[in-house]
Amino acid sequence: MKKILKTLALSLLFIPFIAGCKAPVFYEIMRDVAPEEATVNGVITSITRYKFGTEEKLVTFSSDGLIWKDAAGTAHGQWSCFPNSNQLSGKIIKTAADKSNLYVVTITFHEDVEKGLNLPDAATLWWYDNNNEKWSEVSTPELLPGNFNIFCTNDVDNDNRSAYLRIDDKVYKLNGKDFPTSEKTTGNYNSVVSGDIFFESTASVKNGNYIYWGEGSKLYYSNDTSNPKAEGKKTLALDAGTDISCLAVTSDSILIGRGDFSNSLISKGGIAKTSLKDGIPGNSLESFSTNATSQLASVYQIYTLLVADPNETELNASIYASMGFKGSGSSTSVSYDNIGLWSYYPARGNWNRE
């Protein structure tokens, strides 16, 4: 049985992140470009590959709700509202898909007047019925209070797509509207269970015969897809300087999203990259030939990265990244106008708002 990498996140991604900004380096400022009209705003924690009939789509969410576009789209402004997404109640915090189904998790909140906070009240897993174009709630065990997350392989090959729901140390493989009656128990968050690989890191990606993942600020890789973290199987590639929050690959590069998600109010992260040759990553960070580091700068956090076609080179691929920052932003050169999704398209030749 083909072993497919599954990413296991440790915590619920509904922390109130905020975004923005530009690097204060003269050289980078000179490479800045006029901003496109922002069409996808808000804190975005996932961009999901989804096959709708015969069409390959990308699905994400914004402050306006659930949106999608053709995966082959290579221009600004192509996102549109997902069908009947007004049937969803609550704030969307995550999307996921397997080879046949699309899933969304929403959160409802209540106001704590004494504390002046909006606190999470309940979480709901939704399933989209392709045939009837309607959303239905999936009857799950209670998700809040507790630790849970939805995640998926997000593989380019639709046959390799699987989606999972983790509730504490139980992992359930999703399969449409009916919640599974069996689960996999992970004794720890770096385990192999029934041939499925689960990582504690949200930053992991598989490309060909290699797996790449982040542990803190360090990037590791392995060509042992059955148990890549086993003793003697993993290799340290480099230290990215700041905790690695997400990864994406092209044919010639590994793109590294960074973000400090500790309790510190100092916001730091930004995008970085290293080379990729015959599956082996470089041993140091390398400079971009685009304006990536001036737009996705080190004063904010990168939440997610996606390369539409990993077989393309970095300069010939359509690439998406979402970003944000923590704290008030008053002590750093950030802008609330930059919250949301950013993209690189070959025809445009630079990173800009999506």
Identify the role of each PLM range.
Residues C21-T45, R49-G53, K57, S63-R161, ...:
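Trp- and S/T/G-rich repeat-edge/linker motifs of beta-rich repeat architectures
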Residues M1-K22:
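Sec-dependent bacterial lipoprotein signal peptides
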